[in-house]
Amino acid sequence: MAAGMVATMVLLTCLAAGGLVVGAEEDGGGGGLGRLGSPDYGDALAKAILFFEGQRSGRLPANQRATWRGDSALTDGREENVNLTGGYYDAGDNVKFGYPMAFTVTLLGWSAVEYGAAVAAAGELGNLRAAIRWGADFLLRAHASPTTLYTQVGDGNADHQCWERPEDMDTPRTLYKITADSPGSEAAAEASAALAAAYVALKDDGDTAFSSRLLAASRSLFDFANNYRGSFQSSCPFYCSYSGFQDELLWASAWLFKATRDAKYLDFLTNNQGSSNPVNEFSWDNKYAGAQMLAAQEYLGGRTQLARYKDNLDSFVCALMPNSGNVQIRTTPGGLLFTRDSVNLQYTTTATLVLSIYSKVLKSSGSRGVRCSAATFSPNQISSFATSQVDYILGKNPLGMSYMVGFSTKFPRRIHHRGSSIPSIKVLSRKVTCKEGFSSWLPTSDPNPNIHVGAIVGGPDGNDQFSDNRGDSSHSEPATYINAAFVGACAAAMGQKQVVKLEEPADNLESMVSTY
């Protein structure tokens, strides 16, 4: 290869550490491309965390920064004499779905556990911990007895027929739950994983009583999921599981072993690894890749009985890395991992988080990398590819579009989000009715009056095209689990100093260099 081409490749793949940290601003100011064309990761991280304050349900605290929001859903749970206030609205509607909410908390906890130092350096660890606790508090309340977990608050069908602010909503706050007689092992195990991850992330926060509650509830939920096995598919109206519950049981046991070092959870992982399978996505439904990542971390730490998980995780990497010879998930012409058209960035951000963590673990263990059929990828190459996904989301793409609201100057202005698209209750104090929202606020081409800073939308299509259309929920709607995975991925990019070694296979390097 010519020396000039090598130098160009080094320049393109060396990412800046993020520059000055810029605090998240409510109006979306600041941010953009810094030196060498790298995004300001510190600003993006701050805004990704701020997003969760705009998704809060319940009575808002005095230090609420998304000031366009107000209190909402203050009587949730009353019909069954249980307090189910708080938690997060999952996306652009006003329903609280416990299953993806728990996954959101798990991902936020994982981000804090793996990248707490980088988040702290950005001045955002307190805000991240607050986001974790807001969701974990709800999950604790939802676990009303050893064999009860409330999994949804609100009637999804009725809610989706209205377009109104959460502060105004008058649709039924119907309660859904799993019990010993109507189990949902996926939901119970995911809640267990969430509380275990929250415990690991928050145990040094000074509130020992709260930490003890997290761990006790996590253990209880795992027992509920494991002892009363049944699929959530038969007891859910929305966010039903299609991958079964074995992945969540592995995921929860891996988190509980990380949290407690209790041998019974390691034994569960060891004895059930036959149910671990190679996958090409990581999502609110399919947790295999996450469980494999946690177990592979233990394998590389000396627990060689967990070898199958490491092998499966290597297959996951090979399914994603361009030119691996085993690619299952294609990249768009602009370089974005593209799993499916609807809400694709949820899969991109979760995959990027796993790739980022795995590259770090491989490097710390002294591993040379992952061998695929056509190439071997070093930890640096894996992390470079992961960073390219973060950069794409933040604007290094064919459209020059940041898919994070409020980051840089070109970002989605008409996101599919009820609260963002109707003037704040603090500005328009009268009630906006269900039908008025549909006729007056959903169809307008005007930008949303409330900039939902940090919200990451579903993203572009397979040809890198994006229509900023409020009615297009598949591409314009944000979701908590998109942002939750991005927090860790962005922190990884921020703390990383890329050094491309010239002895690495040139064709592998070229496949990961973005020209945008």
From Swiss-Prot:
InterPro entries on file: 6-hairpin_glycosidase_sf, 6hp_glycosidase-like_sf, Glyco_hydro_9, Glyco_hydro_9_His_AS
Gene Ontology CC terms: extracellular region
Protein's UniProt keywords contain Signal: yes
GO terms classed as biological process: cell wall organization; cellulose catabolic process
Active site, per annotation: D93 (nucleophile), H416, D468, E477
Known glycosylation sites: N83
UniProt main location, coarse: secreted
Superkingdom: Eukaryota
The protein's Enzyme Commission number: 3.2.1.4
One GO MF term attached to the UniProt entry: cellulase activity
Location of the protein in the cell: Secreted
Protein name, per record: Endoglucanase 20
